[in-house]
C-alpha cells in the first residue's frame, strides 16, 4: 500500500506528463507538470519527498528563528532530547545545515510512513502542550506545521541508512513569487 501526503497548494512535478489525476477525470492545469500516482516508483524508493531547498545565506535553525520564535524551537529541541535522545545528532545536523525538504509532502510505503507518524505525532502533541499560542497571529499559529517540516528532515537524517529516499521537484499550483520570497528571506536575515 502507498500513502500520499500533500500540502494544499503544492504537488510533485513530473517531466512529460501535464495533468492532475482527479478522482474521476483528468484536470489540465495550464501546462504545469503535476505528478500522478503512476509517476512514483516505490519499488526503487521507500519514500519520495520534495527536492531540498538550499538556503545560501543562512542555516535551517537561523532561518526558522528569524521567521518564528526561537524559544519555541528550543522547546522542540528539548522535547526531542527527552523523548527520542537518539535523534539529537540528526536534529543538530539538520538545524545547522543549509538544505531542507519543505512542504510536509511525501509519497511512501505504508510501513515507512507509519514509522514516521508514530515518531512525529507524539512529539507534536507534546510541543502543542508546552507552547503558548495566545499571542500568535494566524500565520504563527501554524508553527506545528513549520516544525513538522523540520522534524521530517530530522527523521530522514536519522533513518537514512535504513530507507531509500527519492527527491522530486515541486510545483505550486497557485504560483509562487520567488522574488518576493527571496526578498523577504534577505530582509529577515539581514535586517531583523
Per-range role (PLM):
Residues 1-192:
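ER/Golgi luminal nucleotide-sugar-dependent glycosyltransferases, focusing on the catalytic module
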Amino acid at each position: 500500500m502507498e500513502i500520499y501526503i500533500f500540502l494544499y497548494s503544492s504537488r510533485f512535478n513530473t517531466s512529460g506528463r501535464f495533468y492532475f489525476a482527479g478522482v474521476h477525470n483528468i484536470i489540465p492545469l495550464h501546462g504545469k507538470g503535476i505528478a500522478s500516482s503512476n509517476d512514483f516508483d516505490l519499488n526503487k524508493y521507500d519514500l519520495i519527498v520534495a527536492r531540498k531547498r538550499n538556503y545560501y545565506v543562512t542555516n535551517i535553525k537561523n532561518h526558522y528563528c528569524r521567521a518564528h520564535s526561537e524559544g519555541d524551537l528550543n522547546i522542540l529541541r528539548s522535547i526531542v532530547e527527552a523523548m527520542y535522545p537518539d535523534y539529537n545528532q540528526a536534529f543538530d545536523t539538520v538545524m545547522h545545515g543549509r538544505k531542507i525538504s519543505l512542504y510536509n509532502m511525501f509519497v511512501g510505503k505504508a510501513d515507512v510512513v507509519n514509522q514516521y507518524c508514530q515518531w512525529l505525532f507524539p512529539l507534536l502533541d507534546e510541543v502543542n502542550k508546552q507552547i503558548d499560542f495566545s499571542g500568535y497571529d494566524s500565520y504563527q499559529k501554524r508553527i506545528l506545521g513549520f516544525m513538522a517540516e523540520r522534524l521530517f528532515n530530522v527523521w530522514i537524517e536519522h533513518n537514512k541508512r535504513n530507507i531509500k529516499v527519492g527527491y522530486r521537484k515541486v510545483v505550486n499550483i497557485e504560483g509562487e513569487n520567488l522574488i518576493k520570497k527571496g526578498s523577504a528571506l534577505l530582509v529577515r536575515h539581514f535586517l531583523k
